[in-house]
């Protein structure tokens, strides 16, 4: 009988089962590009496919963007080469690095930094729309990358989720610079229609000049994409979407977003590109104040103390179990420890003094962090209340100016007072000798309308003030209209 052995020798005398051997049918042909081996396809760029690659010398994984120069026109080829020239000069943590270029016959192979988690478009397709908190974390990194680009006179011109990569640690990388341009100065504009319709700025569509401000608009559209799962106007055909981008005041904003995020969108989507903040300026936007969290190191320090005390107990037990009078040698004989200093040095490891010093230091650090945490919470509360205070002050100044204007006009017609009296009246109101909200009683009701009142949304927490119980030593020239004015003020609920 012939015995069949299904195990195979690996050349070192060791056997392994045949199930671990790759069949010839599954073996793929190895494609070498310089010192790199081409792997699986991982994506598609503006002008070609992207593959995973392995450096055969260093073991480093890379992304290899392949472009057949025979299949694209000369202008596109120049655009691709421009991408390499731009990226090769840039070194920033939030921008994909170009490691080199390998040209094989008519094929260009761009060796890029490999970003393992793919694009943010991949992320939202797998996990759905992102939370506002996570979007803010990503947005901050995108702005850092854009600020670096713009400081180097480079505009991306195609910012969107599919062109923004993310590492497994959550680090954002701007990528795909196939349509990027370098400008000599901030005032120089690029006059060509490039980009992807749903993310394009109005000035890019109208060919009125693309600048770094166009990237700010596109980034705003990208944030809408991350928050909702889709870019603005995604239900429309590209041409219709571009028409709406140009004709609308701004794209539709997502619902249920914070006041800070709403303000960020309002700043980013200003139709006049010269009025949009720069990436560097947006890094100071209040939306990022929410990233300041109370340090979690208090609990970490408590855990450290617990571990420290547990370690001390275990170490003391181990040391006490040692027979300090003898030690086992390699020959098996027992030899007394001749040096008493050895014993004392070992025991000093678990001395209470050393542990207590370390414990005291950690407790002091914990107290310092606790104090800082309280200060951070106070600052966050003040920042949260600041917009309300500013809004209240705005209304106050608005109605004071309107009331004084009406009063001056009334006095001018009746010749009942001098301009200096008006100045005194105004100063009294500013110094709060007269309740400023009383001035609303001087304003004829027809002046208090939706057309005249600033279009701001009053805070829901603001209490309405009944003017019927307030008093003033200043005579009211519109006494017969008081009731109407009171109802108007209560209706809008501006005061608190």
Swiss-Prot record:
Record field: compositional bias (Low complexity): 1-13, 458-486
Record-level Gene Ontology MF annotations: ATP binding; metal ion binding; protein serine kinase activity; protein serine/threonine kinase activity
Annotated binding of ATP, by residue: 42-50, 65
Broad enzyme group: transferase
Highest taxon above the source species: Eukaryota
Family according to the record: Belongs to the protein kinase superfamily. STE Ser/Thr protein kinase family.
Cofactor(s) recorded in Swiss-Prot or TrEMBL: Mg(2+)
Alphabetical list of InterPro entries matching this protein: Kinase-like_dom_sf, Prot_kinase_dom, Protein_kinase_ATP_BS, Ser-Thr/Tyr_kinase_cat_dom, Ser/Thr_kinase_AS, STE20/SPS1-PAK
Compositionally biased residues, Basic residues: 487-496
Protein kinase domain: residues covered: 36-288
SMART domains: S_TKc
Coiled coil: 353-386
UniProt name for this protein: Probable serine/threonine-protein kinase DDB_G0284251
Entries under Pfam families matching the protein: Pkinase (PF00069)
Reactions that this protein is recorded to catalyse: L-seryl-[protein] + ATP = O-phospho-L-seryl-[protein] + ADP + H(+); L-threonyl-[protein] + ATP = O-phospho-L-threonyl-[protein] + ADP + H(+)
EC number: 2.7.11.1
Gene Ontology cellular-component terms listed: cytoplasm
Keywords annotated in UniProt: ATP-binding, Coiled coil, Kinase, Magnesium, Metal-binding, Nucleotide-binding, Serine/threonine-protein kinase, Transferase
Active site: 158 (proton acceptor)
Chain positions covered by the region annotation Disordered: 1-25, 323-345, 454-496
